[in-house]
Amino acid sequence: MNQWVSWIIGCCFGAILVGCTMQSNMALSHSQRPYDFESHTLHPRGVAIPGSTDSVDVFFDVNREECLYLRESPQSPFVSQLECTVGAHRFTWVDTLVSGASRWNRKYVRLDWHEVFPEWAGQLVEEIPLSITDLQRNVRHAWTTDVLTKEASLPAYHSDGWPLNTRHAVVGDTLYFYSPTGSTWHHASAAVPTTLPSPPFSHVKDRSDTLEPLIRSTIVSGNSRWNSYIVLPGVNIIADANSAEPRIVQRVYGTQFPFDQVRDLRVMIQSCRYITSRKEFERMVASKDSKAALDAFWLNCANEKDRATQMISTYYGRVEEANRYFSGVLEGWRTDRGMVHIVFGVPTKIRKTGGSEWWIYGEEGSANAVTFRFLRTQHPWDDQFFRLSRNILYRTTWDRMVTNWRNGRIQPD
């Protein structure tokens, strides 16, 4: 997360090291702070795809940098020990650290549905509870993943046969899907507007729900049954070409960079628009040395280098969190939730009721508490699209927070 900190200011940050101290009690994922990336020790990913009528394929990805590797003696290799659960099924996953190992450690298992749910009786399964425990750190992360039913969707795969574990892919990547021989599909796409959400006190409607993807190619599945397409910017869909009614079986969002990372100078400048004046922003965009202009902005806010480094770490750390948790048809930092998360930080409390999220800052019920309500809204290209309930009363609170940023009075989450 901190690579861009040293890149902007020229300050060096050490890598985040995994601790070696065993905790006495099991550390669980922090459901009270679901959008605080740093409050979770492990960030595994899992994809579940039916393998047949009575089995399911589960694909795990675990970041090796987040696991604790130990060895029994100076001559022994370093190994990690993970315990995984898929529903009721439990197994141990041991990984030996070798030179040149990739960042992500992968594990694939095919399980009978009765192993996952002992009471299974042939019914359709829509989601599966998963968990991974680092036995050497005594840390556990549990989550639920949807089952990508082949009747309703065609999972997207990378060239190595591993499924896409998000709905985002870098523009220019080639994705694959498996379909019956002779079936015909349309690949369509639409670029997404790059506008920012209006402040909490201003009402300007988002237009991403008016996108109309255009057909870019027609794909006829051959004897291998494997088909491919190149990811284009914005919304990419695969639709049944022979269906009387539009039947979309795959949706992928094409981004110029890995969607959760903030490494590009243009993105760094664009995402700080929430706390800049219009003139400051236009000056950075038009500057012949945009990096120097961005440096100058942060140093001017903080008044001294070390403070600027901390503010950069906090701000762009929140941008990355917004991308991880809120990205859909829009990049996470461009969404209503992303905007509030970046400027205000991690809420003191989050309440989720039905199709709403209530973000509470400060002591709930007190006169100084600030509450934002986000409503889940129907969107043709995003099933997790939330809109902020805006109100002119937020003007004072918003201006105060922006002023705090500009005066260097922001504390890390």
Segments predicted by a language model, with ranges:
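Bacterial N-terminal signal peptides
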Residues: 8-19
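A cross-family detector of function-defining hotspots
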Residues: 286, 294, 298-333, 337-383, ...
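Intrinsically disordered, low-complexity terminal regions enriched in Ser/Thr/Pro/Gly
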Residues: 21-213, 220-222
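Conserved structural position at the C-terminal beta-strand
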Residues: 132, 240-241
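Short, surface-exposed beta-strand/beta-hairpin micro-motifs centered on an aromatic residue
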Residues: 224-229
